[in-house]
């Protein structure tokens, strides 16, 4: 399913489900903060009651088409159960990624005991702005950069915005590159986050394939590889991360691939059509997602990993073992507690002495933040660009977001650098608000999802280490919650088949000093 909210036909909630909201429903039938699914002129719409107020907005998330009627109402927002996008109940605005586009909003009237929703109202997220920069330059056209550009325009900023990228065609739905697109379930037209025509329509200059080579923080300029010089009032560094390689013989061979860009994914797909056996090096999230996708294409797949249990350092023993069983049930072979020694033309030789046939090799061995540009500009760098609670870097007017940013986490008190798509997008949105003088400290709880065949794992929070793990439910029944604690405090929650519980856990982690379960 596409993440491009403007050019893709998204699935929707059933447009005939529930009552005709133009005809009206009884006020007393609306439970507090409990969405009621109905329809208006063939469009699925939800009603939400808060006290005497009634809100009516579109029922289909603009990210991947999730059903907002099954979401969680928090204040004047509703959170999508699939990937935790947030929409304003009053305006329909997409307040929190991964959704970037608003849903429709509708007028609501009370006629005695009846509540009727009527005409669509204009979505207007604009608020009075503080002092705004003369121009904005965004270096990096990934998740954070694209989300920042969108939010600047959504909030009413009218100055020049330039979005500078490293590659064609511009911002893409990167999670799909290891999931549905790589598996062959998503066409290429689903992959762009936004089209060039979209950026032209909102007057954002997209500069693909011309990366920044130098920043002068004193003059507030950045120079691109082409020699073009851009002046900025505010600058966002969203340079992301670079896939790691391996220091072994054969890693430079033509059938060995990293997986980060659309070009990478296309190259893997092309090679997959020519061979029967693939080896994935690294039992990481991206490595395992790639393994699942290549199995879907009919290849024999072996995953090589140094750990004894896949993802144990992130998900714990029980959930890690479940992930392994799931992949084995789908035909993946594992060589764990092992590592590659040499990659040859048709085989991978392991440290254990095993030799595995491989016409295709995919590296999923982690990433390194791209900090060279920040370092050359004199910014403070320590395992990422160091930023404050408002994502401001150490030079005036400069911000950082996404995989490259290391920020103070208000929940744990630690400095974090998170490599999650949704976190990057939300940080980009937060930077846009900060640039316009309408933001506050970045406080979002980290969230990611990982798809393995027909099983999605949702994870909220951040637990680099823990001293207790609690499993609730049945993993093999695909209905479970895993809670990670340290010194009695809940740090993170993973769920399978419990979407609303994942949303509730995210909210508890944000609002409760010591969230309990």
Name these PLM-found stretches.
Residues 131-205, 244, 291-315, 504:
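Beta1-alpha1 glycine-rich phosphate/pyrophosphate-binding loop at the start
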Residues 40-41, 158, 194-201, 205-224, ...:
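A Rossmann-like FAD-binding core segment of flavoenzymes
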Residues 169, 175-192, 266, 277, ...:
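Rossmann-like dinucleotide-binding cores of NAD(P)H-dependent redox enzymes
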Residues 239-297:
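Glycine-rich dinucleotide-binding loop and its adjacent helix/turn
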Residues 92, 252-275, 347-349, 354-430:
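FAD-site-proximal beta/loop scaffold in flavoenzymes
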Residues 133-137, 404-500:
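Mid-to-C-terminal Rossmann-like scaffold of FAD/NAD(P)H-dependent oxidoreductases
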Residues 1-74, 109-121:
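N-terminal pre-ligand scaffold of iron-sulfur
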Residues 57, 354-380, 453-517:
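C-terminal catalytic lobe of FAD-dependent flavoproteins
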């Amino acid at each position: 399913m596409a993440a491009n909210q403007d050019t893709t036909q998204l699935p929707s909630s059933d447009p005939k489900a529930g009552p005709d909201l133009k005809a009206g429903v009884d006020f007393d039938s609306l439970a507090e903060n409990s969405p009621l699914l109905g329809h208006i002129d063939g469009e699925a719409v939800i009603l939400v009651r808060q006290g005497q107020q009634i809100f009516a907005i579109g029922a289909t998330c603009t990210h991947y088409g999730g059903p907002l009627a099954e979401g969680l109402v928090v204040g004047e927002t509703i959170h999508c159960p699939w990937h935790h996008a947030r929409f304003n109940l009053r305006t329909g605005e997409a307040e929190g990624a991964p959704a970037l586009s608003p849903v429709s909003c509708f007028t609501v009237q009370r006629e005695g005991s009846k509540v009727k929703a009527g005409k669509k109202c204009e979505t207007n997220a604009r608020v009075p702005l503080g002092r705004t920069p003369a121009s904005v330059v965004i270096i990096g056209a990934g998740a954070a950069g694209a989300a920042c550009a969108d939010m600047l325009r959504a909030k009413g900023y009218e100055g020049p915005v330039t979005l500078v990228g490293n590659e064609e065609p511009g911002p893409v739905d990167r999670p799909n590159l290891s999931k549905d697109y790589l598996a062959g379930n998503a066409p290429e037209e689903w992959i762009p986050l936004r089209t060039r025509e979209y950026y032209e329509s909102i007057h954002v200059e997209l500069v693909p394939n011309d990366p920044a080579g130098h920043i002068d923080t004193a003059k507030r300029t950045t120079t691109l590889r082409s020699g073009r010089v851009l002046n900025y009032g505010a600058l966002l560094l969203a340079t992301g991360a670079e896939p790691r390689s391996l220091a072994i013989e054969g890693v430079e061979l033509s059938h060995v691939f990293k997986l980060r860009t659309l070009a990478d994914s296309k190259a893997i797909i092309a090679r997959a059509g020519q061979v029967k056996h693939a080896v994935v090096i690294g039992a990481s999230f991206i490595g395992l997602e790639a393994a699942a996708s290549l199995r879907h294409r009919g290849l024999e797949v072996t995953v090589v990993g140094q750990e004894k249990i896949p993802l144990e350092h992130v998900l714990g023993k029980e959930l890690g073992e479940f992930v392994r069983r799931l992949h084995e049930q789908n035909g993946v072979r594992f060589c764990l507690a092992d590592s590659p020694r040499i990659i040859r033309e048709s085989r991978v030789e392991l440290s254990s002495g095993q030799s595995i046939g491989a016409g295709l090799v995919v590296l999923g061995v982690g990433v390194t933040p791209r900090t060279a540009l920040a370092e050359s500009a004199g910014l403070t760098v320590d395992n990422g660009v160091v930023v404050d609670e408002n994502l401001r870097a150490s030079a005036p007017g400069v911000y950082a977001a996404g995989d490259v940013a290391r920020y103070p986490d208000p929940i744990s008190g630690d400095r974090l650098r998170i490599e999650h798509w949704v976190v990057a997008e939300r940080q980009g949105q937060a930077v846009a608000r900060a640039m316009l003088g309408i933001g506050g400290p970045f406080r979002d709880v980290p969230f990611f999802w990982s798809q393995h065949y027909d099983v999605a794992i949702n994870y909220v929070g951040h637990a680099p280490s823990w001293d207790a793990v609690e499993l609730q439910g049945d993993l093999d029944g695909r209905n479970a919650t895993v809670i990670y604690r340290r010194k009695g405090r809940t740090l993170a929650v993973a769920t399978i088949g419990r979407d609303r519980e994942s949303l509730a856990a995210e909210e508890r982690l944000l609002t409760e000093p010591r969230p309990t379960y």
